[in-house]
């Protein structure tokens, strides 16, 4: 199935274009019947990542950050990941014995091929650089992520609220946690619009 990259602007940024279709009582026909939708914050983000070749030559490492106390389903996510990823390639924060603190998680971002966040997220519409992911000792802010030098992982998966939300008053601004991870070097990012 072909992949269609959407780069919406203005108020179209807030529309779930991937769900467009004819939803009448007779039959359902929708965009997903014809192609897989993917979103990009800018056309420039579609260009090949210059460090893509370098990241493929290093050993695979997955970092998982969870909040199992506040989000019970995060434990299930972690268990499913642990079934598929060898323990020597997995770094887990947010569980007993491995506190998810801001500085440790931020410094490990550059070593990760894939990161999976299953925690709370928050967007600061007035100061977007203060948006971030809630960890054990505070917020991993966009401004802190941007300080890391060589983020070249293949995927950042953000199972957290408000990680791809925009500001309705500034619809052409691409400042969200998901977009920031992409701009900081991750080749692909999955983030939430809720």
Predicted regions and their residues:
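Catalytic cores of enzymes
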Residues: 1-194
